[in-house]
Amino acid sequence: MPDAFPFDNTYASLPDRFFTRMSPKPVAEPGLIAVNRPLAERLGITLGESDAELAQLFAGNVVPMGAAPLAQVYAGHQFGGWSQQLGDGRAVMLGEVVAPDGARFDVQLKGAGQTPYSRMGDGRAWLGPVLREYIVSEAMAALGIPTTRALAAVTTGEIVLREARMPGAVLTRVAASHIRVGTFQYFAARQDVDALQALLDHTIARHYPDVDGPSGLLDAALQAQADLIAKWMGVGFIHGVMNTDNMTLSGETIDYGPCAFMDTYEANKVFSSIDQFGRYAYAQQPQIAAWNLAQLATALLPLMPDRDAAIEEFTEAVNGFAARFDTAWHGVLRAKLGLVSEQEGDAQLAFDLLNRMEQGGGDFTQVFRALSGPEPERAAEAFAAPAVLAPWLKAWRARLARDNVAKAARIASMQADNPALIPRNHRIEEVIQAAVKGDFAPFERLTTALQDPFTDRPEFADLQATPARSEAVTQTFCGT
């Protein structure tokens, strides 16, 4: 059966200044690494069985029928500095598919060759970042966190030059859309009100059909990002490059370049090698989200009839982000601690635990997972200094007693909110190093394990473990 994509391309019907129409650049000798057949089925995409043909498809050598390939343009603030034109420098969107349930998704090839937005880059991707995004985006989906997805990964049979000669690869990314804060900024900076209005109408129709106008879209984006960042922080996730061009209007996580998950808890933890001043540190993520959303609000101002009134309205809305985030974050923390009701002092109880983790070298994931078990006192084993936990445990147990929830119910609830397994940085690095040598078995094992992160499985105990000091990853790289 030939490959079939249920394309219905609405972004391609926007004015030409939104994108450049172009096809992916063919590669020499594509080879299939992985294809996500459950996701393909979810999207209503019919795929053949031939690995060779799938490799040609997902490398961009064959463009599927009904596609309308294009590279999108956008702008953005990168580490606070304004870039008036960015865009898809190495990605080509094949088009939009409409899934059997009516949901609409973009299908994009990353590493598809040079575009008009490549800015001196070669338009290609190397194997490491492709595997990292495949692993982490699929792990995030399994964790229940809004995210882009990975449909396929292929090698290209070509070498790309980075810090060394690296094997090339292409990732097929699926997203609710690729509309970014930076997309709005691009047209606002050019005072292109007609394009801004078209983008607003398109975004609302696609993501928030029940809201009205710029105010409604801003409100929806504020809530979506408050919920998203709280979920990130609930699994110790650090995005690492929260530029405005990496914030979606859909509320999905996008662009996994230097991302990482904390092992030992540190509020101001930074992994990204390019984040020299800690702008995007773990605890800074809510403040940066608010800053980015203020840029969205600014970009929407030209669409408001009364600019002065709009500035006042939007300022109040953005200033309200902190309260939205606190509500979402406190809800995440209560669930992680098994607290059913909302009571005064809950947030302080949670923050006290985090402080003790930081003081005592507690592994973020393992501490919460152990608290979810039948012997929560074993959470002390996940600390370098176990004694710091005992006073907190006493206070937590007293708080649990006030909810009067059966132990079995509490355990089940907490284990559904506290994963046993996350994609630990050192395990991802091991996968990449093996794959560069042609061994994809570790990649297959890790991706299989991460499909079910809330279940303890002895066969994956090594993947759950805190890294030894010699294994710990202290810095991550964009790799673009």
From Swiss-Prot:
Pfam family, one: SelO
NCBIfam families: PRK00029.1
Family named by the database record: Belongs to the SELO family.
Active site: 245 (proton acceptor)
Enzyme class: transferase
Binding locations of Mg(2+): 246, 255
Protein name per the record: Protein nucleotidyltransferase YdiU
Highest rank taxon of the organism: Bacteria
GO molecular function, one term: magnesium ion binding
Signal peptide start and end residues: none
The entry's keywords: ATP-binding, Magnesium, Manganese, Metal-binding, Nucleotide-binding, Nucleotidyltransferase, Transferase
Native species: Jannaschia sp. (strain CCS1)
Residues that coordinate or bind ATP: 87, 89-90, 110, 122-123, 173, 180, 255
EC number assigned by the record: 2.7.7.-, 2.7.7.108
Cofactor(s) of this protein: Mg(2+); Mn(2+)
Catalyzed reactions per annotation: L-seryl-[protein] + ATP = 3-O-(5'-adenylyl)-L-seryl-[protein] + diphosphate; L-threonyl-[protein] + ATP = 3-O-(5'-adenylyl)-L-threonyl-[protein] + diphosphate; L-tyrosyl-[protein] + ATP = O-(5'-adenylyl)-L-tyrosyl-[protein] + diphosphate; L-histidyl-[protein] + UTP = N(tele)-(5'-uridylyl)-L-histidyl-[protein] + diphosphate
PANTHER family tied to this protein: PROTEIN ADENYLYLTRANSFERASE SELO, MITOCHONDRIAL
Function: Nucleotidyltransferase involved in the post-translational modification of proteins. It can catalyze the addition of adenosine monophosphate (AMP) or uridine monophosphate (UMP) to a protein, resulting in modifications known as AMPylation and UMPylation.
